[in-house]
């Protein structure tokens, strides 16, 4: 499988982020956001998606983790969009159900060029480490809107919030891997319109 590499750099008054991804990698990762729990989740996404991710973020963590998490979603979304290029030959859709002990999450992706997000999470704690659990949805929204993809994510059940969020990020990686997979039978893009 050929490489599909993208580099993105973004600097604002709140964050400075640089990333490099290879959509058809081996799941290697070197991720430093300053938010330990978030790094752990992004590592899982990369590993289970077989996406190589190098990412370094410096943010205003003295305020809280919101800007950093959201802006990482923006940068990764831009990276995915750039790495996908013309989208010719990709399967377009990906769905994954991932169990993590007592928790089960599902996540579906459509690389449609039409950003949309639906999340159904019922986390029972406000924070895990230094990350607010509500930022899981903020990250996914930023990713979807900047990559131009639709994401439907749901935690079907679970008791341990770490397990629930871990299942979501593993499912994200696996769904991305399925959606960007290329099929030589697909002539052009997977759409009757001829464009995504």
From Swiss-Prot:
Where is the signal peptide, in residue numbers? none
Q: Which PROSITE patterns match?
A: IGP_DEHYDRATASE_1, IGP_DEHYDRATASE_2
Q: Which reaction does it catalyse?
A: D-erythro-1-(imidazol-4-yl)glycerol 3-phosphate = 3-(imidazol-4-yl)-2-oxopropyl phosphate + H2O
- A Gene Ontology BP annotation from the UniProt entry: L-histidine biosynthetic process
Main localisation, per the record?
A: cytoplasm
Instruction: State one molecular function term (GO).
Output: imidazoleglycerol-phosphate dehydratase activity
* Pathway of action: Amino-acid biosynthesis; L-histidine biosynthesis; L-histidine from 5-phospho-alpha-D-ribose 1-diphosphate: step 6/9
> InterPro entries per the record?
IGPD_sf, ImidazoleglycerolP_deHydtase, ImidazoleglycerP_deHydtase_CS, Ribosomal_Su5_D2-typ_SF
Where can this protein be found?
Cytoplasm
Source domain of life: Bacteria
- Report the Pfam families cross-referenced here: IGPD
Q: Which GO terms describe its cellular component?
A: cytoplasm
EC number(s) stated in the UniProt entry for this protein: 4.2.1.19
Q: Does the keyword RNA-binding apply?
A: no
Keyword check for Nucleus, yes or no: no
Q: Which CDD domains match?
A: IGPD (cd07914)
Q: Which UniProt keywords apply?
A: Amino-acid biosynthesis, Cytoplasm, Histidine biosynthesis, Lyase
PANTHER family to which the protein is assigned, alphabetical: IMIDAZOLEGLYCEROL-PHOSPHATE DEHYDRATASE, IMIDAZOLEGLYCEROL-PHOSPHATE DEHYDRATASE HIS7
Family designation: Belongs to the imidazoleglycerol-phosphate dehydratase family.
Q: What is this protein called?
A: Imidazoleglycerol-phosphate dehydratase
Q: What organism is listed for this UniProt entry?
A: Clostridium botulinum (strain Okra / Type B1)
Q: Which gene encodes it?
A: hisB
